Curated annotation (Swiss-Prot):
GO terms for cellular component: mitochondrion. Keywords: Coiled coil, Mitochondrion. Pfam families: OPA3. Its main location: mitochondrion. The gene is opa3. This is Optic atrophy 3 protein homolog.
Length: 157
């Protein structure tokens, strides 16, 4: 079987990641339409992102005390929806990585358990063989002792 050459789990994860983009786009479209999503999910992160981005740019250019105007609602909703979509893709990709890591760890653990079990089996067999060797050695010594204790047979000349 060619399991190692065709890792089905990796192909499945690739499919999930490819499907995450349309899912993220649908969620972004829903976020743009829903007032609750727009006001409480999209706008606050978008305004925070805009504030941090503009503050960083201003400091790099040397302007210190400038006041940063917030984005208008439409631009903030668009930016928030984009941030939400990217976050969803990132979370799905991260989830795939975590699943792949746990799968690899389980495979590694299973292989280690099989190796430990085979080592234990070999040690048990080695112990049994050593015991058998000792028993046979004792029997050979007993036979040799009995042979030496027998009277010598008369020679027929």
């Amino acid at each position: 079987m060619v399991v190692g050459a065709f890792p089905i789990a990796k192909l499945l994860y690739l499919g999930v990641r490819q499907l995450s983009k349309p899912v993220a786009n649908r969620i972004k479209a829903g976020a743009r339409r829903s007032e609750f999503f727009k006001n409480y999910i999209c706008l606050p992160p978008a305004q925070a992102y805009h504030w941090i981005e503009m503050r960083t740019k201003m400091r790099i250019m040397g302007f210190r005390g400038s006041t940063i105007k917030p984005l208008n609602e439409d631009a903030a909703a668009e930016l928030g929806a984009e941030l939400l979509g990217e976050a969803i893709i990132f979370v799905i990709g991260g989830g795939c990585m975590v699943l792949e890591y746990s799968r690899q760890a389980a495979n590694s653990r299973r292989k280690e358990e099989e190796l430990a079990q085979s080592i234990t089996s070999l040690q048990t067999q080695l112990g049994e063989l050593a015991l058998t060797t000792e028993t046979l050695d004792a029997q050979i010594r007993e036979v040799n002792r009995l042979l030496l204790s027998l009277p010598a047979a008369p020679s027929s000349k």
